[in-house]
Amino acid sequence: MRRCGIYVYPHRERDILCVKIWTIHLGSWGNPMPNRACVQKVLPVTKQISSDGSVQIDTVRAVLPEFQFPSHPQIGDCLSWIETFFSRSLVGFYDQGYTPGEESCTNSTIKGMSGKPTSIISNIYTTTGPAKVSNDYAVRDPGVAVDHFDQYGPLKEGRSLNSAKISTQWSGSATLKSSNRSIFNIGLGYINTFLGVSNVRGFSTGSGRSKNVLNKLDDLSKRSKNYPNLVIDRNLYKDFLLNRDMFLIAYNKLKSNPGMMTHGLKPDTLDGMSIDVIDKIIQSLKSEEFNFTPGRRILIDKASGGKRPLTIGSPRDKLVQEILRIVLEAIYEPLFNTASHGFRPGRSCHSALRSIFTNFKGCTWWIEGDIKACFDSIPHDKLIALLSSKIKDQRFIQLIRKALNAGYLTENRYKYDIVGTPQGSIVSPILANIYLHQLDEFIENLKSEFDYKGPIARKRTSESRHLHYLMAKAKRENADSKTIRKIAIEMRNVPNKIHGIQSNKLMYVRYADDWIVAVNGSYTQTKEILAKITCFCSSIGLTVSPTKTKITNSYTDKILFLGTNISHSKNVTFSRHFGILQRNSGFILLSAPMDRIAKKLRETGLMLNHKGRSVIRWLPLDVRQIIGLANSIIRGYDNYYSFVHNRGRFATYVYFIIKDCVLRTLAHKLSLGTRMKVIKKFGPDLSIYDYNSRDENNKPKLITQLFKPSWKVNVWGFKSDKVKLNIRTLYASHLSMANLENLQCAACQSTYKVEMHHVRQMKNLKPIKGTLDYLMAKANRKQIPLCRSCHMKLHANKLTLNEDKKV
């Protein structure tokens, strides 16, 4: 909402001075459009003030554009008590007309409830100054207060303004209007010099709460991008942690995550979430009494062996963590290095592998790096100090510290660590990226020091010059094709140019705590670079894993990164450029690791001795569900390895193993005996048809069939592209006020204390007509609104939607 001010000008001649300044002059992002909507709110007050007699106006709230007095406080959510006001006044708006009147009041004080001291009305106004660059979302539509005129009477066209006392602090356009409808369009910067007026001072009428939270996030991101070295001095805690809209965004982003139905130490989940619950969290945050509950620590298996600790926190605590993550992402995402790809919007494993495929050609020595227990070894004090160097709001910083120090329960004992960001926490990945950004900058500096490009022009070898001479001579003498072909083959096997000074190149990519440094240089130089990186990591409290970090020659061995084998091609290919045959060497190969895929299929019980197995856990499922699960496995592999060079072999292997698995499972389930009988029943593609409905060709409608991936190689088949960070694009779909506000109970249509009922998965529903599950399945939703009474009845299995159906 944009605000405009109205000035009550006291004058015995019943004249009016209305000065208007466009907000484009107040700040670089001010909205130039004035707000006319508030006129409807002001006119009733105007008529009351303009009437004869004494009038008292109570509790004018400055958040709404109702009325603007001199000395009105700048803080938007402050209440001002206007007891009485001396004046004989006229009130009006430009292009809106005015109603003359005369009234008498008693002069008193204006008290601000925002903590500012009580002050007598004077010529110094508190709502002055333009919108700051550091607070660009404070859209201001100001008026200009004119103290009084002297005995010379009302303003006339062409008359000097020496008698008027106007005060301002900036240059802007203004419109002066008097009773004879004479209008002066002037710039306030020229009033002193051109018209001879002094003490011109402007005031604005709001603190900027009119813009919604997405605009504030977007402005925060733009400021971080445009001024990367400036400290964020905004009140992040108040603007975002005490904002209901932010909780709605966080809730809508998390509500469909199955992990939100997994409880921590307490049995709380997102089930039963309502506006009242959010308001209670906000109140505890406002009083700074909010504390994160300790998590539940479990151990999960690691792919490389061993166990990885996972901390499961309270889902309601995760709402606050999600808000912290969103704000930190808006601040730091524009600052992150392009080499970082983990846990970032628009980036993924595919974007990291694409960067390697396009930029790492020619690098011989590769450092496969890994930070030992990265998430569990980040020092809290150093992390907090790093955040404090960028963010000034200490309440926001202390809330992050509370999240880090929440602790966990293991072996019936509470433990609190002074290092590590707990894995399983929503805010943990962004904090790890912020901390590892130091490593990104360090390696970027190493790259700028190491990179060197040798001379471009190099001489041909004597053998190459001799063969070129023989080729030209053979063509000149019209030699037979066999002789020319023989010379051409020799030319391809001989170095063309003399090797000059070697060009040095260092390339770097990181995904979370896994990173690759590729060096086009000597092995000795590569070892020196690894030693420098190891030393730097030690200085910031991290350890480079000696067992997982190694140096590999990409022309002789393969590098495993993000589940993909990386190597240089040993085959020499040729291509024509402008009719000239050129040799292509050192092509980067990205291939699917067939041995790891086979191992994974064996561990999950889908394969034995390179043959499919009947899956016992699938037997209770329907045929359609079995084929659907098989399709999800095939599509998962197909989507991740969409770019590999060995796609034909990979896709064929996975497809026939999973198909064999489905055939054996269906033969077991349907007691058909052999796989051939299953093929006769469902066809070679294992298709299921609905014979009760027909398509346009009068054929049975296809319900599902086994997915068959394409064998075609597409080396550019990466699923991620460069995405410009846009806060509105990221979160606009999650800002739906209807999700938790103005809800109606689906069972009894009550609007009192309505909250959301959640289910973990849609497949857990039993959509019997007349039940609540039927309503949820019909709407294809995992959440449905229920009032508190119906929600408690549902969990007690006593809720009825009609007289004969129970949930």
From Swiss-Prot:
Pfam families in alphabetical order: AI2M-like_HNH, Intron_maturas2, RVT_1
Location in the cell: Mitochondrion
UniProt lineage: Eukaryota, Fungi, Dikarya, Ascomycota, Taphrinomycotina
Keyword match Mitochondrion: yes
SUPFAM superfamilies in alphabetical order: DNA/RNA polymerases
UniProt superkingdom: Eukaryota
PROSITE patterns, alphabetized: RT_POL
Molecular-function annotations in GO: DNA binding; endonuclease activity
Cross-referenced CDD domains: HNHc, RT_G2_intron
Main location: mitochondrion
Annotated protein name in UniProt: Uncharacterized 91 kDa protein in cob intron
Gene Ontology cellular component terms for the protein in this record: mitochondrial chromosome
Keyword terms: Mitochondrion
Anything else known: This protein is coded in the group-II intron of cob.
Organism of this sequence: Schizosaccharomyces pombe (strain 972 / ATCC 24843) (Fission yeast)
A biological process term (GO) from this entry: homing of group II introns
Domain Reverse transcriptase: 281-566
